[in-house]
Amino acid sequence: MTAAVWTLLLAYLFGSIPAGVLVARTYGVDIRKVGSGNIGATNVLRALGWGPALVVAFFDVFKGGIAVLVARAFGLSDWMLGGVALMAVLGHNYSVFLRFRGGKGVATSFGTLLFLDPALALWTFPIGLSVILLTRYVSAGSMTGGVAAFVLSLALGRPLWEVATVFLMALLIFWTHRENLKRLQEGTERRLGERAEAR
């Protein structure tokens, strides 16, 4: 196989590493059976607190970034960089190690964007964070961040491959948050700081 195919596969496998499951397991907890059942940092925060959640968030961000760095090391084209970024996110969302289930891809999307286009990532981050702090809904901030990244990529005149990549990542974020969106509309979505209970 070519370097491009190997890198896409590696990005998917690296994205598939379920940090939330592994960290929670060290505390004797199956994070998939607590709270929302999601393996991401937000559910880990509700179940185990800030320390474990920050470890999970850090890993989920940087596994996306490392995939991009590997692609650059192989000298892949810009469009392939976008493909690698998306494969890392898909790995997180549909992990081969979890029977193709996984997280929601927000931290991993941010990590890939941080290494693809640091300026765009750093413009997007405070927008999503502001929504989280104002509403205490992580899901609302995540979806807002996805939209903001896409709009900013257009407004700042980013190349087509990057705009397309960001657009697809935003679509994935909305897809994985479809149940959250429904709960937001119903007024039943959990807010940041609420503790998770066993399912």
From Swiss-Prot:
GO terms for molecular function: acyl-phosphate glycerol-3-phosphate acyltransferase activity. InterPro entries: G3P_acylTferase_PlsY. It is an enzyme of class 2 (transferase). The keyword Nucleotidyltransferase does not apply. It catalyses: an acyl phosphate + sn-glycerol 3-phosphate = a 1-acyl-sn-glycero-3-phosphate + phosphate. The chain crosses the membrane at residues 3-23, 50-70, 78-98, 113-133, 154-174. Keywords: Cell inner membrane, Cell membrane, Lipid biosynthesis, Lipid metabolism, Membrane, Phospholipid biosynthesis, Phospholipid metabolism, Transferase, Transmembrane, Transmembrane helix. It comes from the Bacteria. It is found in: Cell inner membrane. Its main location: membrane. GO terms for biological process: phospholipid biosynthetic process. Pfam families: G3P_acyltransf. Pathway: Lipid metabolism; phospholipid metabolism. SMART domains: G3P_acyltransf. One of its GO terms (cellular component) is plasma membrane. Signal peptide: none annotated. The keyword Cell inner membrane applies. Coiled coil: none annotated. Catalyzes the transfer of an acyl group from acyl-phosphate (acyl-PO(4)) to glycerol-3-phosphate (G3P) to form lysophosphatidic acid (LPA). This enzyme utilizes acyl-phosphate as fatty acyl donor, but not acyl-CoA or acyl-ACP. NCBIfam families: glycerol-3-phosphate 1-O-acyltransferase PlsY. Probably interacts with PlsX. This is Glycerol-3-phosphate acyltransferase. The gene is plsY.
